[in-house]
From Swiss-Prot:
E.C. number(s) listed in UniProt: 2.3.1.275
Keywords: Cell membrane, Lipid biosynthesis, Lipid metabolism, Membrane, Phospholipid biosynthesis, Phospholipid metabolism, Transferase, Transmembrane, Transmembrane helix
GO molecular function, one term: acyl-phosphate glycerol-3-phosphate acyltransferase activity
Complex and partners: Probably interacts with PlsX.
Name of the protein in its database record: Glycerol-3-phosphate acyltransferase
Chain segments annotated as transmembrane: 5-25, 50-70, 74-94, 115-135, 151-171
Pfam families the record matches: G3P_acyltransf
Gene: plsY
Localisation: Cell membrane
Membrane topology: Multi-pass membrane protein
InterPro entries: G3P_acylTferase_PlsY
Length: 209
């Protein structure tokens, strides 16, 4: 069992470490995404700098990384002994501190969502709905991401799912830390917005006065 756990942790970290946006940008679009837009290698910056198709692919793969990592205990039939969330946590670690990107990485949002998908698909749907609602309200991917992960942490506390609460709490801290520059921009009214939603409408209306 010990070696199985170590093996799952290593695989989870390596899966999470795959810098999807960086590699797609470099090998398909011949662009270094780290030098474009926000410089982040995650989904949002991929959408903004490489386009819709690339963004969708990166989103799918980054979610899949978390799902596959957290599904390992199910594959091995030991999910009753080894909690999938604890294994999946190492995928988010890999995503933010990637061995393939000089220990830099993304903001862990999509990969964390993938972990939740493997563990509890219903909560994954809830998180997605919250994300979409906040995105339509604020027009800010960063705000939607932080609210979405925070909501899962609060829900886990409410339903007494303690391991989920611990993992979601850790990931909430990671997501907020990785979004610290976004938080400063939100507070100063300078955060980037998607071109739809109430926040975008109000900003455009204000600027066009």
């Amino acid at each position: 069992m010990f070696f199985e756990i170590i093996g799952m942790i290593i695989i989870a970290y390596l899966l999470g470490s795959i810098p999807t946006g960086l590699w797609i940008g470099k090998y398909i679009y011949h662009k270094d995404i780290r030098k474009l837009g926000s410089g982040n290698i995650g989904t949002t910056n991929t959408f903004r700098t490489l386009g819709f198709k690339a963004g969708v692919v990166v989103l799918f793969i980054d979610i899949l990384k978390g799902t596959l990592a957290a599904s390992q205990p199910y594959f091995l039939g030991i999910s009753g002994t080894v909690n999938p969330l604890l294994i999946g946590l190492f995928a988010s670690l890999g995503h933010t501190v990637s061995i393939f990107d000089n220990f830099h990485g993304g903001k862990a949002v999509a990969t964390s969502a993938g972990i939740l998908l493997a563990y509890n698909p219903l909560l994954f749907v809830v998180a997605c709905l919250i994300f979409i609602f906040v995105l339509c309200l604020t027009s800010m991917v960063s705000a939607a991401s932080m609210v979405g992960i925070s909501a899962i942490f609060i829900i886990a506390l409410f339903i007494h799912a303690w391991i989920l609460a611990i993992v979601a709490g850790i990931l909430t801290g990671v997501v907020f830390y990785r979004h610290r520059s976004n938080i400063h921009r939100i507070l100063s009214g300078k955060e980037s917005m998607v071109s739809f939603g109430l926040g975008y409408y109000l900003r455009e209306k204000k600027q066009n006065k």
